[in-house]
Amino acid sequence: MLSFQHVLKALLGHELGGLDFRLTDAAIDSRLVSESGLFIALHGDRTDGHLYVDDAFAKGASLALIDHPIKSAYPILDLNSVELQIPDKPPFSLLTDNSLLALQKLAAYWRSRFDIKVIGITGSVGKSSTKELTANVLSKRLVTLKNAGNMNNEIGLPLTLLKLTDEHEVAVLEMGFYVPGEIKLLCDIAHPQIGIITNVGTVHAERAGSIEVIAEGKSE
């Protein structure tokens, strides 16, 4: 199970020793945080997760990732500080340079700890149904992790990977594409050994620019 020291290893490159505690789950919505979970404060179009850090702690979260100073009733550990003074006990926040990048780094680190097959699925249409079908077939014989719903982007895929446990034998991950470079980012995080492209169409052409750009992006 993910722990505080794992988070430090992912973000700093090393553990600090001393205090450690398990993190049961990860969430970006303070209303959905689990007891002893990890809350990642992200900047959204309508609101800012940093406004709800203390709400997440009140719900039972043990740790939060933030990327700018906030008013909080709980300690804040600045990871850029020369002398890191870890609080005596949770809950508290970790101040990072970018909370989204911190989530992605943590997910990539956590994925690297597991020697399992990862299947990445993308395509203009049909990727969700292909993911569900593939996961359903594999789950008959193997303990399978898959994205829930459409958690297939730079936020949802990392959150999915943080659910990996020693019991999982394969992961089936849907990967969404909106702009060039996005599939590469998701692959750098998940490191799939098998890739499936369902098809290439003009979906999201208004963002990508052309079907040629979409085809190139899907091939990343």
Tell me the role of every PLM-derived stretch.
Residues 2-120, 129-140, 162:
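Short, basic phosphate-binding NTP loop
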Residues 8, 95, 101-220:
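Phosphate-binding loop of NTP-binding sites
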